[in-house]
From Swiss-Prot:
Function, as annotated: May be a cell-type-specific regulator of pigment cell differentiation.
Name under which the protein is recorded: Homeobox protein Hmx
Gene Ontology cellular component annotations, sorted alphabetically: nucleus
Organism: Strongylocentrotus purpuratus (Purple sea urchin)
Residue spans of biased composition, Acidic residues class: 238-247
Gene of this entry: HMX
Length: 405
């Protein structure tokens, strides 16, 4: 191409810096699938040196050495478009920065890839080692942004959000127009921008680091079970074991209830009425007569004594209640009778009753203050005193007869 321009007399044009960077990014171990062969008419012409300078110092041209095959186009689409090898190979899952197979310089080492390989080479296959190192350094610097300044910081552990964030940082670093449609991550976002970004970071059916196995546990890319899922599974088994342990004593404690016949119950009741407590010999003899064990007879007497104590307590309580009710009734009756007596005493009227007889003189003489019923006796007047006494007694009781004459 440069030789044809020299023959035509045109001044050679230097490719843009982006084209030059794209040429530098081509790795030597990946030759192009479309090598350009020089025409036969120009095969015998001598090649110019790799670098030459015209009158203008700003124009420089870089030609690859003759041993390396030359590619046809150096456009962005041809560089960024995946080759046939990458089309056939399956898309590798994005590597997390905390992966154990990631070294300190940003390269992945381990038996998965077989050799040292940059983690971003699968995402951008057309970039060289130097550009990938620079991009890895930029990504490491972007990872040191404080989580409080980032929107959607609660989605940092989401694999889809992680892949979207690093892809957006790569586009922002290279000035791609696809990233300019969204505001920078560190800048405050409006509601519409948040909704748009939420739609972009919605989970898609892509392969992630942790996948759910057939048993329902979380597994990483190597098939090992994550500690959280193992802990939950162990806790579930422990809880099931605890439930089994809790249910096992209940099953052991459950016993069959002994059913006694009517004759056995009658014999036991009659024995209990005679004696509340049995000795060991009496218990053994009763068990032998009833064809029961000593334990069954002992338990029956224990239950019967408990029932008897409950009955006695109930009877005593009912007797106490009846006695208390009787006492209250008597107290109420006494109170009512006292009230009635007091009311009757208040209604009573005292009326003086005079006793009148057919002897008004005697009655008048009794009420006269000058006549005494018993005059003072004097010596020599015994007959007079006796006569006065007899007259007084006859006045009080007319039917009585006088003894002294």
């Amino acid at each position: 191409m440069d030789s044809s321009r020299e023959l035509s007399g045109e001044e050679p044009r230097s490719p843009s810096p982006r084209h030059e960077t794209s040429k530098m990014r081509l790795s030597p171990d990946r030759p192009s699938h479309h090598p350009a062969r020089p025409p036969a008419s120009l095969a015998s012409q001598p090649l110019r040196p790799a670098h030459y300078q015209d009158d203008d110092d700003s124009y420089r041209t870089h030609t690859p050495p003759p041993s390396q095959p030359r590619t046809k186009g150096f456009s962005i689409e041809s560089i960024l478009s995946p080759t046939d090898k990458h089309r056939k190979s399956p898309r590798s899952p994005p590597m997390s920065p905390s992966s154990p197979s990631m070294s300190s310089n940003g390269y992945s080492e381990g038996p998965i890839y077989g050799s040292t390989r940059h983690p971003l080479s699968a995402t951008v296959p057309g970039l060289g080692r130097a550009a990938l190192d620079e991009l890895a350094a930029h990504r490491a610097a972007a990872l040191h942004i404080p989580s409080a300044a980032l929107p959607f910081s609660h989605l940092a552990h989401n694999p889809a959000f992680y892949a979207w964030m690093h892809g957006a940082s790569f586009l922002h670093y290279h000035g791609m127009p696809a990233f300019n449609s969204h505001p920078p991550i560190a800048q405050p976002l409006t509601n519409s921008s948040r909704l748009a970004m939420a739609k972009d970071i919605s989970p898609r059916p892509t392969q992630s680091h942790s996948s759910f196995g057939e048993e329902g546990g979380e597994k990483d890319s190597r098939g090992r079970e994550s500690p959280d899922s193992e802990h939950r599974r162990n806790n579930g088994h422990e809880e099931d074991d605890d439930d089994d342990d809790d249910q096992s004593p209940q099953k052991k404690k459950k016993k069959t209830r002994t059913v006694f016949s009517r004759s056995q119950v009658f014999q036991l009741e009659s024995t209990f009425e005679v004696k509340r407590y049995l000795s060991s010999s009496e218990r053994a003899g009763l068990a032998a007569n009833l064809h029961l064990t000593e334990t069954q007879v002992k338990i029956w007497f224990q239950n019967r004594r408990n029932k008897w104590k409950r009955q006695m307590a109930a009877e005593l309580e009912s007797a106490n209640l009846a006695h208390a009710a009787q006492i209250r009734a008597q107290a109420n009756l006494a109170q009512v009778s006292a009230v009635h007596v007091h009311a009757y005493a208040q209604r009573m009227v005292r009326v003086p009753i005079l006793y009148h007889e057919n002897h008004p003189t005697t009655g008048s003489s009794l009420h006269s203050p000058n006549i005494l019923p018993f005059p003072m006796p004097y010596p020599g007047s015994y007959h007079q005193i006796s006569s006065s006494t007899s007259s007084t007694s006859s006045a009080r009781s007319p039917t009585s007869t006088s003894i002294v004459t």
